[in-house]
Amino acid sequence: RKNGWGKEIPYKSPAKARKIEERTVFIIEYQDKVAIRKRPPKGLLASLYELPNIEGKTSGETVPQVLGLDREQVAWVELLPEAKHVFSHVEWHMTGYRVVLSQEEEPLSCFMVSREELEHTYALPNAFNAYTKLIG
């Protein structure tokens, strides 16, 4: 640039660091059904179906409360392995829980689908692969 070449040689500014987002993902099951929901029409993974999830990280003891359920509505909660998914500009660091319900409920604006419907009708984004492979 001192030589006056700065205007002739293109300069690529360094890439911004990806934003890290903590997320908690839930596999909510009742008998042979699994809860899913549709994402908002704008933003990341717009209008796609997903496993229910929330921003941030929560502990197993607070899962029923986070889902808006009473403890008697939840048969058990199992901590699942952590997972990571990298998008171009954001990175999800995910904690997962399997939540088995004692009665059919639809928390977090979800609806229940059979495992067969999940496999053949409702495609879930690759971001959830670490958890979708644990269903069924």
Question: In which residue ranges do the predicted regions lie?
Answer:
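Intrinsically disordered, low-complexity, charged terminal extensions of DNA damage-control enzymes
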Residues: 1-136
